[in-house]
């Protein structure tokens, strides 16, 4: 079983989400019981909606619980160095256009592309791992190959 890197903050968010989902369980069970009391289950939209909600809730709980043992919780304040690893904030320059982009490389459970946080497992994340400032990388993106120059590599600590 491989490990999944995650920050302490990210792990705390996932544990809080799990607690919230578990807290929701009794409400869903109550909604199912109330809908069942309404009679004919074949045409009872409330019952079917509550059962569907229960299924999605249980699937999410099971998914999170199955991932927790795989997490490798990383103290972001201990990260550093020249090489790009989990937790690095990297500024890239598109060799063709000259456009710069800045990404922070995190685990898959913390990635948020809109915030510039990419997964260590993404095409860009995979291409950057182990590289240093000044290197060039080719990313096999869905729209084709993109060549980037690595402008800077820094470690900022916790990401929120």
Curated annotation (Swiss-Prot):
Residues 14-38 form a coiled coil. It comes from the Bacteria. Necessary for efficient RNA polymerase transcription elongation past template-encoded arresting sites. The arresting sites in DNA have the property of trapping a certain fraction of elongating RNA polymerases that pass through, resulting in locked ternary complexes. Cleavage of the nascent transcript by cleavage factors such as GreA or GreB allows the resumption of elongation from the new 3'terminus. GreA releases sequences of 2 to 3 nucleotides. GO terms for molecular function: DNA binding; RNA polymerase binding. GO terms for biological process: DNA-templated transcription elongation; regulation of DNA-templated transcription elongation. Pfam families: GreA_GreB, GreA_GreB_N. Gene3D superfamilies: Transcription elongation factor, GreA/GreB, C-terminal domain, Transcription elongation factor, GreA/GreB, N-terminal domain. Keywords: Coiled coil, DNA-binding, Transcription, Transcription regulation. PANTHER family: TRANSCRIPTION ELONGATION FACTOR GREA (PTHR30437:SF4). It comes from Maridesulfovibrio salexigens (strain ATCC 14822 / DSM 2638 / NCIMB 8403 / VKM B-1763). This is Transcription elongation factor GreA. The keyword Transmembrane does not apply.
């Amino acid at each position: 079983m491989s490990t999944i890197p995650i920050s302490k903050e990210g792990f705390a968010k996932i544990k809080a989400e799990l607690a919230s989902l578990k807290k929701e369980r009794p409400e869903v069970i109550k909604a199912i019981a109330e809908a069942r009391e309404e009679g004919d289950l074949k045409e009872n939209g409330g019952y079917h909606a509550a059962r569907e909600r229960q299924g999605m809730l249980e699937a999410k709980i099971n998914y999170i619980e199955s991932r927790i043992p795989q997490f490798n919780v990383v103290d972001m304040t201990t990260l550093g160095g020249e090489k790009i690893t989990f937790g690095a904030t990297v500024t890239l320059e598109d060799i063709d256009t000259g456009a710069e982009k800045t990404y922070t490389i995190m685990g898959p459970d913390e990635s948020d592309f809109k915030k510039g946080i990419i997964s260590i497992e993404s095409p860009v994340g995979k291409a950057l791992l182990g590289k240093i400032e000044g290197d060039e990388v080719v990313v096999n993106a869905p729209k084709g190959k993109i060549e980037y120059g690595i402008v800077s590599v820094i470690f900022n600590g916790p990401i929120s």
